[in-house]
Amino acid sequence: MHWLRKVQGLCTLWGTQMSSRTLYINSRQLVSLQWGHQEVPAKFNFASDVLDHWADMEKAGKRLPSPALWWVNGKGKELMWNFRELSENSQQAANVLSGACGLQRGDRVAVVLPRVPEWWLVILGCIRAGLIFMPGTIQMKSTDILYRLQMSKAKAIVAGDEVIQEVDTVASECPSLRIKLLVSEKSCDGWLNFKKLLNEASTTHHCVETGSQEASAIYFTSGTSGLPKMAEHSYSSLGLKAKMDAGWTGLQASDIMWTISDTGWILNILCSLMEPWALGACTFVHLLPKFDPLVILKTLSSYPIKSMMGAPIVYRMLLQQDLSSYKFPHLQNCVTVGESLLPETLENWRAQTGLDIRESYGQTETGLTCMVSKTMKIKPGYMGTAASCYDVQIIDDKGNVLPPGTEGDIGIRVKPIRPIGIFSGYVDNPDKTAANIRGDFWLLGDRGIKDEDGYFQFMGRANDIINSSGYRIGPSEVENALMEHPAVVETAVISSPDPVRGEVVKAFVVLASQFLSHDPEQLTKELQQHVKSVTAPYKYPRKIEFVLNLPKTVTGKIQRAKLRDKEWKMSGKARAQ
C-alpha cells in the first residue's frame, strides 16, 4: 500500500509495464515529477490492494472496526459491514461467480440490480475473480437487455426481481449466456439464487492477480447515432484513478459519504465504491426505490452523513421543499456531477443551508476530469480545474490549444503520454475510438472555455446527446422506439430546456395520414407510454410536437440542429453546439 498512498498525479506510459507491483515514491520525488512521467505497477486489483488492506488493518488491531458499507431501505431495515466483513463477504461472492457458476477470468457479466448490498458484493466479486462487470440500470426493457447481452457476448447476468421477466423474454436469443443469477428472496426456474449460494460459499478466495491494463468493466454509453457503444475500462483506469482522485471532496477515513446515483452509472462505481474505500471511509446507500426529496432530507437529518454527491437535479428538487424544517448536523461537503450546476442553484442552496456545492465534470470514458476541490475557490458557473493526472485543454478544429477565454472543444491530452484514467477504447469499434482523437487530444464531445486560472466553463455539447437529470440519452434510441408505433412516419428527437431537469427529451413527429384526425393529447400519451414500454422509461419524450415535415439536408438527413436551435432560442436560453 505504500506506493498506493503516493500515487497522486500518477499517469502511465502507454504500453509500459513494470516488473514489480510495488512502486516507491518519496515526497521529494513527488514534488519533482511532472504530469505523464510516472509508471504504474504491472499488477493491480482494487479488492486485494485496497479493500483487503483495510481489512488486514482491522484484523491486526491497527484500525478500529468502522463501517465500510452502511445500507438502509427506509423501512427500518439496515445493514452495516466493516472492512473485514466486506472483504469476507466479497470473497464469498467471488467464490459464487468462479465456483458455483463456473465463470472464468475475462468472462463478461451483466449486473442489473437496484441499490441493494448485493450490487457492491457482485462488483467486488467480479474484480476478485478477474471477471468483466457490465452495470446496467433496472429501468432497461427487454430490447435494451437483448442488445447488451448480444453485443457483449455476456456469459452471465446478475439481476433482481425488477427485470427477471425482461431477461427471460430474450435469454433464448443470447447464445453466449450460460448463467442467470437471481438476487431475490424467492427462487425462479432457470435461475440460480445468489443469496442461497452466497450463504454456502467459503469466505476465503484467492484473488486473481490482474494486470493494471487488463479489462475490468464495460459501460454501455449512448451516442447521437446508432446504438450504445461498449466503453471498456481497465483495473488501473478505474481503481488507480479513483485512488488518485479520492479526497478531493474533503472526505476522510472516518467520514460517511452518500452518492445518490443509479447503479448503472459509472458514478456509482467511482463515488459509491472506489473513492470512499480508497480512503478507508464509509459509503452510505439508501435503497431509494424512487426519487423522493422528502426521503433524502429526512435521511440527511437522521444519519451522520458528512459528504453527499448527486446530480444538480437532486439539489434543485430539494430546494423545492421547505428546508427550514430540516437540520443537517453532520453534512459538510456537497458535490455535484452529471450536468452543469446553475449559479442560482448554488446561491439558493448556500442561502438556505449555509453549505457550498462543489461542481465536477467527467464522462464514462474518462471518469473525473475537472473538479472544484475542497481547497479551491468556487466560481459560480465553472466546473473547476483539471484532475491531477489530466492535461485538459480547449482546442480548435485542428487540435491546437486555444488561449484562455476562447471557446472550443474540451480535450484531454493522450499523446505522447496516455494518462491513467482514460478508458481502453470502444470494444470492437477501433474506428469510433480513433474518431474521438484530434491531434494529441481525446475529445469529450463538449464545448468549453478555460479562464486564466485554469477553471473550465461548460458551454454545451458538441453533439446531440440529451442530458436529462444526469441520464445521457441518445436521440436515435428514442427515435427507434417511436418508429415502432404505427402512427409515426418520421421523427426527430432533441433536447428541450427544463427548469428542473435541465433538459428533457422532445420528439417532433410526422404522423401517418390515418392518425391525423386523432386527438393530439391522447395520441401524445399513447406515444409516451409506447416508448416507456419498449425502452428504459427515463428516455421517453416528455414533450411531443406534431409537424407536417422535418428539416433535412440535400442528401435527406434530418437536421436535428435546426430543430434544437429553434427550441432553445424560443426558451431564451443558449445551448452551444
UniProtKB/Swiss-Prot annotation:
The keyword Coiled coil does not apply. Keywords: ATP-binding, Fatty acid metabolism, Ligase, Lipid metabolism, Magnesium, Metal-binding, Mitochondrion, Nucleotide-binding, Phosphoprotein, Transit peptide. InterPro entries: AMP-bd_C, AMP-bd_C_sf, AMP-binding_CS, AMP-dep_synth/lig_dom, ANL_N_sf, Mitochondrial_ACSM. CoA binds at residues 139, 469-471, 501, 532, 540-542. The modification Phosphoserine is found at residue 513. It is found in: Mitochondrion. GO terms for molecular function: ATP binding; benzoate-CoA ligase activity; decanoate-CoA ligase activity; fatty acid ligase activity; fatty-acyl-CoA synthase activity; medium-chain fatty acid-CoA ligase activity; metal ion binding. Its EC number is 6.2.1.2, 6.2.1.25. Its cofactor is Mg(2+); Mn(2+). ATP binds at residues 221-229, 359-364, 446, 461, 557. Monomer. This is Acyl-coenzyme A synthetase ACSM2A, mitochondrial. It comes from Homo sapiens (Human). The lineage of its organism: Eukaryota, Metazoa, Chordata, Craniata, Vertebrata.
